[in-house]
Amino acid sequence: DAPSTTPPQDXEKKAAEFQKTFTEQXNQLANK
């Protein structure tokens, strides 16, 4: 379970940042 001190918006924000970083890294690997 997620901590009750973490708002759902914060989790969504971190998830979006993680997805963005993951996509950028994948693009770098694909471009090599």
Swiss-Prot record:
Keywords: Lipid transport, Secreted, Transport. Residues 20-32 have a biased composition (Polar residues). One of its GO terms (biological process) is lipid transport. The keyword Ribosomal protein does not apply. It is found in: Secreted. Hemolymph. One of its GO terms (cellular component) is extracellular region. Signal peptide: none annotated. It comes from the Eukaryota. Residues 1-32 are annotated as: Disordered. Equilibrium between a soluble monomer and a bound lipoprotein form. Apolipophorin-3 associates with lipophorin during lipid loading until each particle contains 9 or 14 molecules of apolipophorin-3. Belongs to the insect apolipophorin-3 family. Assists in the loading of diacylglycerol, generated from triacylglycerol stores in the fat body through the action of adipokinetic hormone, into lipophorin, the hemolymph lipoprotein. It increases the lipid carrying capacity of lipophorin by covering the expanding hydrophobic surface resulting from diacylglycerol uptake. It thus plays a critical role in the transport of lipids during flight in several species of insects. This is Apolipophorin-3. It comes from Diatraea grandiosella.
